Amino acid sequence: MENLEELRIFLEELEQICYQIFQSGFSSVHDTTLQELKIHSKEAEDYGLFFASKAMYELWEILEASKHQFSADYTKAVILFGHLKEYLFWCLKKLELMQVRLTLETQPE
């Protein structure tokens, strides 16, 4: 149960990073948010969240490169962001179900 709680907290941190990106817009993401995105992409792999890891790293690459462009195309970033948000949503839902199942299995009849 502790591992599930740790994973839930991590997924919520990823959601928060996505919220910060959404709030600032792709063309003006804060440097600290970009740094968090890169760091958390590596941590996601440690949790076995390989899709999230890859999507976050690719998103970081696009946003980092676009900082130095006058007119950047964010099409790929928007698609990655959408897929990442949906992935995180379903990960959190699955985690909820796992926690409920575990709670039900450990209750005495």
Residue ranges and their predicted role:
Residues 1-18, 50, 68-109:
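Amphipathic, coiled-coil-like alpha-helical segments
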Residues 10-17, 36, 55-59:
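Amphipathic, well-ordered alpha-helical segments in soluble domains
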Residues 17-28, 44-47, 63-70, 91:
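Secondary-structure edge/capping motif, primarily at the C-terminal ends of alpha-helices
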Residues 26-36:
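Alpha-helical segments in soluble extracytoplasmic regions
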Residues 33, 47-63:
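Short, well-ordered alpha-helical segments
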Residues 38-42:
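Amphipathic alpha-helical segments within well-ordered protein domains
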